[in-house]
């Protein structure tokens, strides 16, 4: 069939307008969570974002015990009318150490003491690490893991089936810091909650982005944003408003002007990676230090001194003979466009 030059020109113009508007396929993600307050904000952000396709939610102990976290996740899925998403229970405790919970920061039930209605949703019968393994094999190179709690479930999945590592598209985790901690002087809470699991995950070899305190502490949801959330209403909007209000009030007791959006920011990076700057670094997790257990130790220059042993009449010593390259294993978020993310968060919770 032949087209006239005029018709061809019209078709080209039509397609030039249409094609940029075509939406990319939503990114498939699995959220692994210890459902506390900022987890709640992260989950609702993910469920309200058309860029994301939440394939499963798995629960790990951390902010609250595993049973409470599972109940919280069930109620949130029901509130959002998303019982179609598989929800699975996982580990009941860290790999080696005793569980550390944080009701002080999250309320007695982990959800700012807000009593959500009983859930209509059901728990998936599969164990969380098994569900993660199954979904990665079913959709190779398509699913991004977004763990926003201790990394116990992810480590258990890797230990059970190392072949999942190349099957994951990416892993975007909330955790760690290269500039000091919040659980201790050097350790961030999610990594401190299970350092051995974190070391397994960091050394596994997949594309990994660390969304830590370095950017989370710069991303504060303030009373200005709370006022914006208060302009609209709905089950999810009203719930997140109350959670945010609880966290802001808690932060004000310590002189903070807002609440850090730790977990939601990891979901934000899954939506739009351009909101952060994330140079490549080699990251290890300290598992033995008396004062440094749980620290994420980042090699910013990806090199170590090369020390060579030499023998001398007066004794042996090492001499520095240049540098040895260390392969980076993570993108480490160091800068963030906080206002861009906060505008995104508020608009999505409002259903815009």
What are these regions (language model features)?
Residues 25-33, 37-75, 109, 115-218, ...:
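Active-site histidine-anchored catalytic micro-motif
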Residues 27-29, 70-138, 320, 325-332, ...:
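Metal-dependent C-N hydrolase catalytic cores
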Residues 1-11:
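Bacterial N-terminal signal peptides that target proteins for export
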Residues 77-81, 136, 140, 205, ...:
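Structural signal for hydrophobic packing residues in well-ordered secondary-structure cores
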Residues 9-20:
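Bacterial N-terminal signal peptides
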Residues 25-27, 44-45, 53-54, 192, ...:
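Conformational coupling and interaction surfaces
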